[in-house]
């Protein structure tokens, strides 16, 4: 198994619920290390740039509006099969379809306010991590 790095965002709904620590405990319990982290309030331009891949989708405006509605916690996670592990921890995009015990089943309210974002592939993970943590702002251990 390869050591991978992936991006995770704890979205405004989960930050507002004060469950950052509970979500971090799940990352660490699954063997993932937080190698970079910061809390930020995205600007509209930053959210539009980050989610540019969805620009033509009907949900784009609502997604951007939601992501700028409050602070988010952004972290780079590292570990064996980090991308798949993180996606398994998150659960299905729609919390109603997410397996019990996943982050979205436990903390998300709707398909829009779904608590977390995670990279879906190695290529997107590299781009997304670099978006939030350019240069040498990552500390493997």
From Swiss-Prot:
Gene Ontology CC, one term: cytoplasm
Cell compartments where the protein resides: Cytoplasm
Binding site residues for ATP: 11, 59, 87, 93, 104, 114
Keywords noted in UniProt: ATP-binding, Cytoplasm, Kinase, Magnesium, Metal-binding, Nucleotide metabolism, Nucleotide-binding, Phosphoprotein, Transferase
Cofactor: Mg(2+)
EC number(s) on file: 2.7.4.6
Descriptive protein name: Nucleoside diphosphate kinase
Gene symbol of the encoding locus: ndk
Chemical reaction(s) catalysed: a 2'-deoxyribonucleoside 5'-diphosphate + ATP = a 2'-deoxyribonucleoside 5'-triphosphate + ADP; a ribonucleoside 5'-diphosphate + ATP = a ribonucleoside 5'-triphosphate + ADP
Family: Belongs to the NDK family.
SMART domains: NDK
Keyword Protein biosynthesis found: no
A biological process term (GO) from this entry: GTP biosynthetic process
Signal peptide start and end residues: none
Complex and partners: Homotetramer.
Entry keyword Cell membrane: no
Active site residues per record: 117 (pros-phosphohistidine intermediate)
Recorded GO MF terms: ATP binding; metal ion binding; nucleoside diphosphate kinase activity
NCBIfam families to which the protein is assigned, alphabetical: PRK00668.1 (NF001908)
Described purpose of this protein according to its UniProt entry: Major role in the synthesis of nucleoside triphosphates other than ATP. The ATP gamma phosphate is transferred to the NDP beta phosphate via a ping-pong mechanism, using a phosphorylated active-site intermediate.
InterPro entries membership: NDK-like_dom, NDK-like_dom_sf, Nucleoside_diP_kinase
């Amino acid at each position: 198994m390869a050591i991978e790095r992936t991006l995770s965002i704890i979205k405004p709904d989960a930050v507002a619920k004060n469950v950052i620590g509970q979500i971090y405990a799940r990352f660490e319990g699954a063997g993932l290390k937080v190698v970079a982290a910061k809390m930020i309030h995205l600007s509209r331009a930053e959210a539009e740039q980050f989610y540019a891949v969805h620009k033509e989708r009907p949900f784009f405006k609502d997604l951007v509006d939601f992501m700028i509605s409050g602070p988010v916690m952004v972290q780079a996670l590292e570990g064996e099969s980090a991308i798949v592990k993180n996606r398994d921890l998150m659960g299905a995009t729609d919390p109603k379809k997410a397996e019990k015990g996943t982050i979205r089943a436990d903390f998300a309210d709707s398909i829009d306010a779904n608590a977390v974002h995670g990279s879906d592939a190695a290529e997107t993970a590299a781009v997304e991590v670099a978006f939030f943590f350019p240069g040498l702002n990552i500390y493997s251990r």
